[in-house]
């Protein structure tokens, strides 16, 4: 997929670090596909407002420079280390560079999620017998398909949004990470809020891995009803009486429920569904899937708010207290506080150990409380404020924007705003969130 027609990123020493492919190709995050119209009821009104407001010309705007400014993401940093000879990536005949890259980027194997559907440029290599594996941490997502020619990366740059790379799965003295320009054909769309972002579709999938178009599809996040999640994905974990679309395969003429059964629900193992040799984990953990979908939504919102603010400042209209920028800030705050989250009606338990690993990664306050602690009985997080508030991208938001975010959070968490959409935030929730943030987020104002 590499091309000789390429531009190179350069550091201060002028050495080539990451080649930027000039050819437009449909390379996207594994398991993540083109934004499509969401079936009735799946869209959320507030996000529709942002989605309807495009940002024409933003990629090339002087305040953004998506393809021209230096990148400061984890994959670019890894590329620099490999190019400088500071890090050697060992090649394995089965998994290629996957394991050393996961180690170098601190991406846990326990985060593995498996996609059965034929989405992405390497769709010919993907079906229920050879799923696409996705691994992630707070900043980077790595995609691997057994026997496919590429590893794929989607990584959040603190200012640029999600940046896409690919790596050839063949032995090389110094593997070269290609920055992929064509990914934005699908990864800058209505569903990503018109910024380079993340997508995670839920489809009605046929036994050969194709999406059955007659039923439409969903672009789920933490607000999406459980029963509309994970179509086209393998799912391991228990979830009581709740139903989901994972592990199910539909045929033309089926109704929406016909393929969902005891065989597809509450699976603690994928034994008998496909040959798992060549994958680092035997799981496609339900808790990892829930966390990933929440994180994808926040990733897009943080990028959108940052881009709106930087473009507005460049054009001399950076008032965060009124107009579109204020609305974008309010949407981000609502997402951080899990406003509109679909409630859980049964306990959820994963199988890979991801939940325990995630919850233990902090930071914690003096009472041992953390925004990474999971509830999984009524909702995703024990304390309903997103851990993504600690991310490098959030910290990179303009100071005035972060101040506006904190001011809006104060209105809600102090109880001054008791609008109906925040009624699921109990007084104890609000107090705990304030206390945790006051100790663990340095610039969070004391209340």
Regions found by a protein language model. Give the residues of each.
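Serine residues within intrinsically disordered or low-complexity segments
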Residues: 5-9, 21
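Bacterial N-terminal signal peptides that target proteins for export
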Residues: 17-32
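Bacterial N-terminal signal peptides
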Residues: 30-41
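Boundary at the C-terminal end of the N-terminal hydrophobic targeting segment
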Residues: 42-47
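Conserved small-residue
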Residues: 48-122, 131-138, 225-227, 232, ...
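Short, structured secondary-structure elements
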Residues: 75, 110-115, 120-131, 145-155, ...
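Sequence context surrounding c-type heme c attachment/ligation sites in exported
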Residues: 137, 143-339, 380-447
């Amino acid at each position: 997929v590499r091309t000789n027609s390429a531009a190179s990123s350069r550091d201060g020493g002028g050495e080539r670090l990451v080649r930027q492919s000039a050819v437009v190709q449909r390379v996207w995050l594994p398991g993540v596909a083109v934004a499509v119209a969401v079936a009735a009821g799946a869209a959320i009104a507030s996000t529709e407002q942002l989605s309807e407001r495009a940002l024409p010309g933003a990629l090339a705007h002087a305040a953004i420079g998506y393809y021209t400014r230096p990148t400061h993401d984890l994959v670019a940093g890894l590329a620099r280390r490999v190019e400088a000879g500071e890090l050697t990536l060992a090649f394995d005949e089965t998994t290629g560079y996957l394991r050393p890259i996961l180690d170098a980027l601190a991406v846990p194997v326990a985060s593995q999620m498996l996609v059965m559907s034929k989405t992405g440029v390497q769709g010919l290599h993907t079906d229920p017998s050879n799923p696409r594996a996705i691994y992630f941490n707070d900043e980077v997502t790595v995609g691997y398909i057994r026997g496919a020619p590429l590893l794929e990366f989607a990584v959040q740059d603190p200012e640029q949004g999600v940046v896409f790379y690919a790596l050839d799965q063949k032995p090389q003295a110094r593997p070269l990470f290609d920055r992929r320009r064509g990914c934005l054909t699908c990864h800058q769309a209505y569903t990503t809020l018109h910024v380079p972002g993340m997508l995670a579709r839920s489809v009605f999938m046929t036994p050969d891995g194709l999406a059955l178009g007659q039923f439409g599809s969903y672009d789920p996040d933490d607000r999406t009803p459980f029963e509309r999640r994970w179509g086209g994905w393998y799912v391991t974990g228990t979830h009581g009486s709740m139903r989901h679309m994972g592990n199910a395969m539909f045929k033309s003429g089926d109704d929406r429920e016909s393929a969902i059964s005891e065989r597809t629900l509450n699976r603690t193992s994928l034994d008998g569904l496909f040959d798992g040799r060549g994958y680092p984990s035997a799981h496609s953990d339900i808790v990892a899937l829930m966390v990933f979908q929440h994180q994808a939504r926040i990733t897009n919102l943080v990028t959108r708010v940052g881009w709106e603010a930087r473009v507005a400042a460049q054009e001399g209209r950076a008032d965060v207290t009124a107009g579109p920028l204020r609305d974008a800030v309010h949407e981000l705050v609502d997402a951080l506080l899990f406003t509109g989250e679909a409630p859980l009606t049964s306990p959820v338990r994963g199988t890979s150990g991801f939940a325990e690993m995630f919850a233990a990664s902090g930071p914690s306050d003096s009472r041992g409380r953390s925004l990474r602690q999971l509830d999984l009985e009524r909702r995703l997080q024990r304390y309903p404020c997103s851990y993504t508030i600690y991310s490098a991208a959030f910290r990179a938001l303009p100071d005035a924007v972060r101040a506006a975010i904190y001011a809006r959070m104060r209105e809600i968490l102090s109880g001054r705003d008791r609008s109906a959409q925040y009624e699921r935030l109990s007084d104890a929730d609000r107090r705990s969130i304030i206390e945790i943030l006051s100790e663990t987020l340095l610039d969070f104002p004391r209340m």
